[in-house]
Amino acid sequence: MKEIVLASSSPRRRDLLKQLGLTFRIMTAGVDETPPGGLTPAEMVEVLAGRKAAAVAGMLEDALVIGADTVVVLNGRVLGKPADREEAAGMLRQLQGTDHTVYTGVAVMDAASKKMQVAHEKTRVFFKSLDEHEIRRYVATGEPMGKAGAYAVQGRAAAFIKGLEGCYTNVVGLPLARLADMLKKFGYNVL
C-alpha cells in the first residue's frame, strides 16, 4: 500500500489518524491560507484543503497526501483561528447560547498520478450560554488558541456543548468516515 502523509501539523488531526490505526508521517508546506473571495464556506475549506495536499504532494514521488482545513460559521460569518486572547474571548461571546456550523474540507491526493479527491463535511454545534467569567477562565487556559472558532470540542470546551448534529470528528478537525471513504477510492482500506 502507498505511504500516507498528513499535510498538517495539527496534533488533533494526528491523533484522529492514529485512532484509525493508520501508519503515516507528517509533512507541511508553506501554503497561502487566504481563500479566494466569493466562495461559500464549503468551497473555501475544500480549496484550502486541496492547496495543502497539493503543496506536500509536489514534494513526493509516491504517497497519498491528506490535507484538511476547518472553519466555524456563525450567521454566515466565518470564524477562523483567533489572533490573540481578546479575539478568542470575542468569538466565544458570539458563539455562546447559539448554534453554529463547523465545515472541514478534506483533500486526498496521489502524488504519483496527481489525482485528487476533495470533499467537505459539516456539523451543527449547539453551545450553552456562558457568562463572562467562564469565557475568561477558558481563554486563560490557552486552549482556544490555534483553533477555529476559539474552542476545542475534545478539550475543556466539551463542557460548553449542548449537542451536535453530524460528525463529531469533523468538529475536532478531520471527518474520519468521510476520509475513510476517500482513501478507499484510492485503493487504501483503513480496516
Swiss-Prot record:
NCBIfam families: maf. Its main location: cytoplasm. InterPro entries: ITPase-like_fam, Maf-like. Keywords: Cytoplasm, Hydrolase, Nucleotide metabolism. GO terms for cellular component: cytoplasm. One of its GO terms (molecular function) is dTTP diphosphatase activity. It holds the Pfam family Maf. Its EC number is 3.6.1.9. One of its GO terms (biological process) is nucleotide metabolic process. The active site is at 69 (proton acceptor). It is found in: Cytoplasm. This is dTTP/UTP pyrophosphatase. Its cofactor is a divalent metal cation. The record marks 12, 70, 154 as: Important for substrate specificity. Nucleoside triphosphate pyrophosphatase that hydrolyzes dTTP and UTP. May have a dual role in cell division arrest and in preventing the incorporation of modified nucleotides into cellular nucleic acids.
